[in-house]
Regions:
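Vicinal oxygen chelate
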Residues: 16, 63-108, 115
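Short secondary-structure junctions
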Residues: 28-34, 82-87
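Amphipathic alpha-helical segments
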Residues: 15-30
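Conserved short beta-strand elements that form part of the metal-binding/catalytic scaffold
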Residues: 30-64, 107-113
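N-terminal beta-strand motif that seeds the catalytic metal site of vicinal oxygen chelate
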Residues: 1-18, 60-62, 115-116
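Alpha-helical segments within the soluble intracellular
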Residues: 24-25, 42, 77
Length: 116
C-alpha cells in the first residue's frame, strides 16, 4: 500500500498571470515553477497548479482550511476589491468561512476553520 502525501488542485485559468497574482499577492503563495503556460504556487507544503483553461470548463470548488479565518480575512480584505466575495460567516456544519471567486477562473475558493 502507498502513503498519500497530499493532493494538489489543478485550476484552469483564462489568464495565468492574473490568477497567479491572486495566489501570490493575496494568499501569499510563492511561485515555484513557471513554464510559460503552466505554473505551480506553494505555501506551507501545499501546492496549486495553474494551467490554461479549455473552452468548456465547468465550475470548480476547493476548500482551504486555516487556523484563524478572521485573521485571514483581516489580512486580505483590502486586497480583494472587485472580486466576488462572501465575508466571514458561520455555517450550520460547524465551520466559519470566507468564499472568494478566484480571478479569471470558474473556481470558488472556500477558506474556513472549525468553530466550537
Amino acid at each position: 500500500m502507498y502513503k498519500a502525501i497530499y493532493m494538489s488542485p489543478m485550476i484552469p485559468s483564462f489568464d495565468l498571470q492574473i490568477t497567479g497574482i491572486f495566489f501570490k499577492d493575496i494568499l501569499n503563495f510563492e511561485k515555484v515553477f513557471d513554464s510559460g503556460n503552466y505554473t505551480i504556487y506553494e505555501k506551507n507544503n501545499l501546492t496549486v497548479h495553474i494551467l490554461p483553461a479549455g473552452e468548456n470548463i465547468g465550475q470548480m470548488e476547493f476548500y482551504l482550511e486555516v487556523d484563524d479565518v478572521d485573521t485571514f480575512w483581516d489580512t486580505i480584505k483590502d486586497k480583494i476589491l472587485g472580486l466576488k466575495v462572501r465575508e466571514p460567516f458561520n455555517q450550520d456544519y460547524g465551520m466559519r468561512e470566507v468564499h472568494i471567486e478566484i480571478p479569471k477562473t470558474k473556481t470558488l475558493l472556500f477558506i474556513g476553520q472549525a468553530v466550537s
